[in-house]
From Swiss-Prot:
Involved in plasmid partition. PROSITE patterns: RECOMBINASES_1 (PS00397), RECOMBINASES_2 (PS00398), RECOMBINASES_3 (PS51736). GO terms for biological process: DNA integration; plasmid partitioning. This is Resolvase. InterPro entries: Recombinase_CS, Resolv_N, Resolvase-like_N_sf, Resolvase_HTH_dom, SSR_resolvase. SUPFAM superfamilies: Resolvase-like. The gene is parA. GO terms for molecular function: DNA binding; DNA strand exchange activity. Residues 15-159 form the Resolvase/invertase-type recombinase catalytic domain. It comes from Escherichia coli.
Length: 219
């Protein structure tokens, strides 16, 4: 693997950080590996791969924040899909992109702003036009990602209402295995934050499960 020191003198190393969805699905993993390979084939040194469990509709994603903190000037963030970067409302999504650019980094998303387009040599008016088009495409893609997220939530809400009306809705199924792990860890003295991290859920969910279990024990 190339390092900064191994590059020929005078040649600037192109560095990328890749942001992905955490997945165990074989097809998703193959697609992600293809993205990593394509980034390297484009001449980029991959300084980090960040696999996120949290939803793109959240601004406080741990891996996203870690990646932004790691960014150095001149680097490129390569996202698997635009909705991995953000499903936030457009204003919040633009602030997120601005925080990446504030570190002196650029954003590349296949099909929106490709690595080849970022590397394109342009000066003067041509450069301004190219960057303006890239910004417009990125803004449009961010808005479409948010619209898709809201459409999915609305369809889910309508589905729940129809199921309730038909007497078929029973609510979200309990994950017995996850609940058991939470109870075991908390009973062993693990903090709420540590338990949430180990189990892969939110601290609020740990609190709910633990409170429900304690209430059951007191009956």
């Amino acid at each position: 693997m190339a390092t900064r020191e191994q590059q020929p003198e005078g040649r600037r190393l192109k560095v990328a950080r890749i942001y992905l969805r955490a997945s165990t699905d074989e097809q998703n993993l193959e697609r992600q590996e293809s993205l990593v390979a394509a980034t390297r084939a484009a001449g980029y040194y991959v300084a980090g791969i960040y696999r996120e469990k949290a939803s793109g509709a959240r601004a406080d994603r741990p891996e996203l924040l870690r990646m932004i903190a790691d960014l150095q000037p001149g680097e490129v963030v390569v996202a698997e899909k635009i909705d991995r970067i953000s499903r936030l409302p457009l204003a919040e999504a633009e602030r997120l992109v601005a925080s990446i650019r504030a570190k002196g980094a650029k954003l590349a998303v296949p099909g929106v702003v490709d690595l080849s387009e970022l590397a394109a040599e342009a000066n003067g008016v041509a450069k301004i036009v190219l960057e303006s088009v890239q910004d417009m495409l990125l803004k449009l893609a961010l808005q479409m990602a948010r619209d898709d997220y809201e459409d999915r939530r609305e369809r889910q809400r309508q589905g729940v209402q129809l199921a309730k009306a038909a007497g078929r809705y029973t609510g979200r199924k309990r994950d017995a295995g996850m609940h058991d792990r939470i109870i075991t860890l908390r009973s062993g003295g693990s903090s709420i934050a540590k338990t949430a991290k180990l189990v892969g859920c939110s601290p609020s969910q740990v609190k709910r499960v633990w409170a429900a279990w304690n209430a059951q024990q007191q009956k």
